[in-house]
Amino acid sequence: MGKTALIHHVFQQILKEKLAYCLYVDLYPTASIRDLTRQLATATMNVLPQRKRIGKKFISFLKSLRPVIKYDPLTGSPEVRFEYATDTDYEVTLSALLNFLNEQETDVCLAFDEFQVVTSYAEGNAEAILRTMIQPLNNIHFIFSGSNRHMMNEIFHDSKRPFFASTRIVSLPAIPSEEYGRFIEDRFNERKRTITSDAIGFIIDWTRRHTYYTQSVCNTIYGSGGKNIDLQSVKVICGEILEEQEKTFLQYRHLLTLNQWQILMAVAKEGKVYRPTAAEFLEKYSPGTPAGVTRALDSLMTKEMIYEESDINGRYYSVYDLFLSRWLERQ
């Protein structure tokens, strides 16, 4: 289960117990406050039951904002747009939408997914605008989620940024191997399939217990149709997964300098690199000078090819895409 699926799963539990209204807003396709306003209005309209009092209140409120409502020809779901002349009008409307939700008797859980996108908004100061709007709200529980760890850390950990110290950071550790193994075995058994313990162990180790990749591998294994899955068949399928993506991975080579590519490959082969400028690493992979390695790592992080994380042994670098990492190991 990835972060987005986890948010929806939590929302399902909240809705089941009727604790709050839950709104999910994907910011990935947005590029401005204007786009965010449209996404939030659309999400609110689709979630609040229109036949109930709160839904009728929202429709009445929405009309005062002069919206343009269109319906998706495939799903029939409404899409809300606004056609204002100035950026300020969109900021006023966004603030009004948030205040409307905040004033309801029932709590609201609002998830902004891919939140790091706001750092590249056309407004330039979008973080400050949003922080000013959000700070006084006490009836909305915000979830800020993002796939770019580097940018998310900068947004919430940099003392010079508007959202510094404004949230509680939640880190999700990897699921324990034994527990994960039982779960995988149970899911296959439910579908009248058998999978050996060493095959499960290989899946868990190969995917490093990263839920997205573990689920992807297991789905591919299940889709292969095999009834009795052993270690060898799992290894073959993992190899096929990498071969399917090889053309994409080769394209990355043309997007990077030779030095960046060499360092990316070195990080992949190590799995985790704690001291990239240490003599041992430099002698083993000959990636250049310590200064050159540092510049290359910074560039690779900006390109979201690698990420920086911490464990009990200290801070380390790893390749962002695990399938790419496994493919590079074989080169």
What is each model feature region?
Residues 1-109:
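P-loop NTPase nucleotide-binding core
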Residues 4, 210, 321:
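Short, conserved phosphate/pyrophosphate- and ester-handling motifs at nucleotide-, phospho-/glycolipid
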Residues 13, 129, 220, 299-303:
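Alpha-helical DNA-recognition elements
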Residues 80-148, 157:
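Conserved Walker B catalytic segment
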Residues 149-167:
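Short regulatory helix/loop adjacent to the ATP-binding pocket of P-loop NTPases
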Residues 168-179:
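Conserved AAA+ ATPase "SRH/arginine-finger" region at the nucleotide-binding site
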Residues 181, 185-248, 258:
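Amphipathic alpha-helical "lid/sensor" segments that cap RecA-like P-loop NTPase cores
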Residues 243, 247-331:
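C-terminal leucine-rich, beta-strand-based interaction scaffolds used for sensing/assembly
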